[in-house]
UniProtKB/Swiss-Prot annotation:
Name of protein: Small ribosomal subunit protein eS7
Any one biological process term the GO annotation gives: ribosomal small subunit biogenesis
Pfam families: Ribosomal_S7e
GO cellular component: 90S preribosome; cytosolic small ribosomal subunit; small-subunit processome
GO molecular function, one term: structural constituent of ribosome
Length: 190
């Protein structure tokens, strides 16, 4: 497999996605990640600019997400070197099924699984974003005007490894879901 990108529906990859794919192929041939990278591929990639800093979002197929997460720390480090310091995040390529209404209920014989609901997908995106850190708590603050602010508590042990990326995580999550989120590293309760 010379290319590392398989898009849904067999559509062609654009130039940016091809460059990401090429970087993964180079990593596979040159580094000690060869064995782990051989079976892996991505479904799409996006580049977004936030506060004059660019970030790269790489979508991976759900069955391969666990395998990507095993090597994610090293893979992110290598890709960030290659793409001159742009922050790289890996996210599982999930599908959201629409909420069944009275009209559509007849057409769908199957019940919508919990993993395909909007809430579940958005929570999972948040977990993928902050990997390798773990979410230890979450507070949702609803303001008087109805807007929500999500406070996510991350594991204090991982503060040194991901603290510099917190702004990227906030802006990527806002771009993908439209939800405001802040990250904190609270002291563990005893």
């Amino acid at each position: 497999m010379s290319t590392k990108i398989l898009k849904a529906g067999g559509t062609e990859a654009d130039s940016f996605e091809t460059s990401i794919s090429q970087a993964l192929v180079e990593l596979e041939t040159n580094s000690d990640l060869k064995a782990q990278l051989r079976e892996l591929y991505i479904t799409k990639a996006k580049e977004i600019e936030l506060h004059n800093k660019k970030s790269i979002i790489i979508y991976v197929p759900m069955p391969k997400l666990k395998a990507f997460q095993k090597i994610q720390i090293r893979l992110v480090r290598e890709l960030e070197k290659k793409f001159s310091g742009k922050h790289v995040v890996f996210i599982g390529d999930r599908k959201i099924l629409p909420k069944p209404s009275h009209k559509t209920r007849v057409a769908n014989k199957q019940k919508r699984p919990r993993s395909r609901t909007l809430t579940s997908v958005y929570d999972a995106i948040l977990e993928d974003l902050v990997f390798p850190a773990e979410i230890v708590g979450k507070r949702i603050r609803v303001k008087l005007d109805g807007s929500q602010l999500i406070k996510v508590h991350l594991d204090k042990n991982q503060q040194t490894t991901i603290e510099h990326k917190v702004d990227t995580f906030q802006s990527v999550y806002k771009k993908l879901t439209g939800r405001e989120v802040t990250f904190e590293f609270p002291e563990p309760y005893l």
